Amino acid sequence: MAEGAAGREDPAPPDAAGGEDDPRVGPDAAGDCVTAASGGRMRDRRSGVALPGAAGTPADSEAGLLEAARATPRRSSIIKDPSNQKCGGRKKTVSFSSMPSEKKISSANDCISFMQAGCELKKVRPNSRIYNRFFTLDTDLQALRWEPSKKDLEKAKLDISAIKEIRLGKNTETFRNNGLADQICEDCAFSILHGENYESLDLVANSADVANIWVSGLRYLVSRSKQPLDFMEGNQNTPRFMWLKTVFEAADVDGNGIMLEDTSVELIKQLNPTLKEAKIRLKFKEIQKSKEKLTTRVTEEEFCEAFCELCTRPEVYFLLVQISKNKEYLDANDLMLFLEAEQGVTHITEDICLDIIRRYELSEEGRQKGFLAIDGFTQYLLSSECDIFDPEQKKVAQDMTQPLSHYYINASHNTYLIEDQFRGPADINGYIRALKMGCRSVELDVSDGSDNEPILCNRNNMTTHVSFRSVIEVINKFAFVASEYPLILCLGNHCSLPQQKVMAQQMKKVFGNKLYTEAPLPSESYLPSPEKLKRMIIVKGKKLPSDPDVLEGEVTDEDEEAEMSRRMSVDYNGEQKQIRLCRELSDLVSICKSVQYRDFELSMKSQNYWEMCSFSETEASRIANEYPEDFVNYNKKFLSRIYPSAMRIDSSNLNPQDFWNCGCQIVAMNFQTPGPMMDLHTGWFLQNGGCGYVLRPSIMRDEVSYFSANTKGILPGVSPLALHIKIISGQNFPKPKGACAKGDVIDPYVCIEIHGIPADCSEQRTKTVQQNSDNPIFDETFEFQVNLPELAMIRFVVLDDDYIGDEFIGQYTIPFECLQPGYRHVPLRSFVGDIMEHVTLFVHIAITNRSGGGKAQKRSLSVRMGKKVREYTMLRNIGLKTIDDIFKIAVHPLREAIDMRENMQNAIVSIKELCGLPPIASLKQCLLTLSSRLITSDNTPSVSLVMKDSFPYLEPLGAIPDVQKKMLTAYDLMIQESRFLIEMADTVQEKIVQCQKAGMEFHEELHNLGAKEGLKGRKLNKATESFAWNITVLKGQGDLLKNAKNEAIENMKQIQLACLSCGLSKAPSSSAEAKSKRSLEAIEEKESSEENGKL
């Protein structure tokens, strides 16, 4: 190895070759990841990975300027109805010549060829200087070289044999401490560690694709450095090509090695149904034209070449090479490590992995020998097993025994309409659709019909109607098809007394014992649970006083349409209309009695738990803005129903998130109107098995807790999380419905929207990929801080970039709690909410803990965080000495709890950084990397796993280099901090819990105590708010500490298992393995016994 790779390098003079040797210091140095390469070589087109082309190809500078102009974010939330989109803006162009200027990367051979041709990379120095250099791989594959350089040619090189490790991303000290690091694209950066001291050569490519080529190629060369490099002979003997030959020969009935083009096209479509026939035919023509032949017959070689170019997704190939230790296939062990370390799958075994291989590998040889090649791996990643949605949430997974008021309830507005509320006819299919979608609250707006038969109709036009009886028969049939949990019928009664009696009789007859009519118990304080009300139908409506002698009476008419009347009428005097109600209909109303809202103070004093209020969107918005805390507290006990403003004459939808943030349970939506708001609603209720009930966050359920719907900061007692999303690629994007451009040309980009409390709302977008709908590569990473994960949703939106109105392609909305980590495919939905076949986004998801406040736009490293003053959640002064003295006792335990959690997290991040891994990496990945550093040249470990008091320590087996000492020191610190937390957590948590209990003893008398001390009005309210804040902090920090302890215990288990699998254990005998297994359980058993002793 030449020392030139890491030695001092002065900036080259301005007159050096091409003038490119001047260091570029500043934003221009790394802000643009796509720049023209020197030497007449073609640059990346962003529609695929470019291999070298002919010299003299002009640089696409105009396209670069257009890309920069389009970089301004747009509001993707404003999605227009595609049927109303009009032509306008620039025209999209279609090229009818398809000879490619680039070739996809589909093998290691392609990577090596690219590296030998060379390309420009930016070389980053520790002094923050950046140099443009042209890097190439020697023809003998033994060294990297770069130019221009002031060094001798033999020094401006790096021997492949000296390379220890290749890291993708900004994961070295040079990148982390460089002043320009924030301006360097994470996905374009990579580092080559070399020499005994692991010095780093830090580089930035012009695109993520180019970075992936270099990383994959170098890893392949390093892994093969001790083996003959015979792969350069070509790809003809790889398992993939052998399988394709078998497929071709089976279809070649004549056995002459030639097949009709039509037959070849059909065969490739059978192997990959997502491909378009026209694209396959075009590929054959390209291949034949390159060979200067024109024929309608295809050879075996041409068939294999076409299939590999059409069906190889470069981003999947790079991933496979990365996790397979640079083979071009995965064995069972590779797959097991991928599932455990990257996908977060637990309890995985070799047999499970072999079963996956047998189900997804396409070749018979692969299935028999137990390996998964690129095509089978692609199929596996596209399968439901790698869906982004957590399969546990596809069934009922939440506690269903809480009071009804503790759940969000899937609700429909104007269920009987299938169009807008002015022109739309009444239709029975509206109920069928809503109930099949898991709706648990439907609306029946009933009026008098002819022949004493109540009807449902659109009272704005009275054109068509359906009979009340037919509607409730349909409801009875479909009520519990999608969910067994209770169905609420919101009765809009506009009938005369005789027809009210008919309604009551028909409901009794059709629903029978499904009708819930039990009188509420005054001794109870909360509504029954969904579990207790399973398969029951609850009628919401007006109710007469309980006097049985009163057979009929007047009640207030809270017709939703009265809002419009009040707005439109100049004669409205504020008095509510009275209607007559019969006893028979009144008796069907039990635990959902409609009452009028006055104010929160009156409601909290006099409202019964079985009474509920309906709020118009306008009124609810006003209340949410003026009294956010009161609204949340009110909804802990009482049900609230929110319905869209009557001014929405087009039946557009309100934003349900605004009212879910206030704890409102029944936010009624116009199911007949698709769009972003309905996407949020549909996505939210996919969780918990789609049963129509979603448990609200505990901070919105606890009797004493502090939460404001308008909060824009960190919540007391809730630890914010960092959500890392990498948008890798898209697959098979359709042309937008109603788009005006000819052909299938689209310029897609992706928006990521975070919906939740105001503190969490955020939006980011990718770059635009020009003219690529089949497999656009985005390769962009985003990070978001999520303060209340239980109430957050992520919406992926794909749009077609246009100067006038970006057109909708597809979207997918998912609750934060349903995200699966790792590499996942996102199935996109159409504008009306239907899943589009084969249309997906390929993403990587990671969720990590985050300390401190502020929006998470840039990664905070532990080294930097350690220099900051640690922020502690502070308790508030109430103004009542007795209570304040109790809460003061908790100050020290709270600081201890926060210190233990943060110290452990910082120690974990530090060891990850030393391993060259980002904070999102798992400890399993960390130990795999660490073990590779601790294995000597003769393949023996330099350290050994030693269990001390059931904790996994690593001890040197002799003298070790300073680099390894540094890593072991960081590892020991992680174990020490984890051990300290595990051993001290229960004691500290007990102190916090005791302070919380002591404080809660004053809860009932808080107002009286405040009055005695002279607190009243705003001061008393402030004292009550501060008391709730303190209780919330204590409960939350206690729970966080308990969770941190469980996490630490699980980490110790994973570390020990990883050490065993990586060969860092002295004795692999069965007795040693049994002893290790017992050690895994020792900590947990010890902790369990201590907990049981306290009970």
Curated annotation (Swiss-Prot):
Outline the segment boundaries, as ranges, of region: Interaction with GABA A beta subunit: 543-567
Record InterPro entries: C2_dom, C2_domain_sf, EF-hand-dom_pair, PH-like_dom_sf, PH_domain, PI-PLC_fam, PLC-like_Pdiesterase_TIM-brl, PLC_EF-hand-like
Annotated TM spans: none
| Reported modifications of this chain | Phosphorylated by the catalytic subunit of PKA. Phosphorylation of Thr-93 resulted in dissociation of PPP1C from PRIP1.
GO biological process annotations for this chain's record?
A: gamma-aminobutyric acid signaling pathway; intracellular signal transduction; negative regulation of cold-induced thermogenesis; phosphatidylinositol metabolic process; phosphatidylinositol-mediated signaling; regulation of synaptic transmission, GABAergic; release of sequestered calcium ion into cytosol
Top-level taxon in the UniProt lineage: Eukaryota
Gene Ontology CC terms, in alphabetical order: cytoplasm
Domain PI-PLC Y-box, chain residue ranges per copy: 585-701
Question: Phosphothreonine is carried by which residues?
Answer: 93, 556
**Domain C2 intervals:** 701-830
Query: Where does the PI-PLC X-box domain start and stop, copy by copy?
Result: 398-542
The ranges of region (Disordered) come to 1-61, 1066-1095
- What is the tissue localization of expression for this protein? Expressed in a variety of fetal and adult organs including brain, lung and kidney. Its expression was greatly reduced in small and non-small cell lung carcinoma. Isoform 1 is predominantly expressed in brain.
Compartments reported by the entry: Cytoplasm
Q: Which PROSITE patterns does the protein's record reference? A: C2, PH_DOMAIN, PIPLC_X_DOMAIN, PIPLC_Y_DOMAIN
Where are the coiled-coil regions?
894-914, 1034-1059
Q: Where is the segment annotated Interaction with PPP1C?
A: 83-222
User: What does this protein's UniProt record list under function?
Assistant: Involved in an inositol phospholipid-based intracellular signaling cascade. Shows no PLC activity to phosphatidylinositol 4,5-bisphosphate and phosphatidylinositol. Component in the phospho-dependent endocytosis process of GABA A receptor. Regulates the turnover of receptors and thus contributes to the maintenance of GABA-mediated synaptic inhibition. Its aberrant expression could contribute to the genesis and progression of lung carcinoma. Acts as an inhibitor of PPP1C.
Task: Name it.
Answer: Inactive phospholipase C-like protein 1
Species source reads Homo sapiens
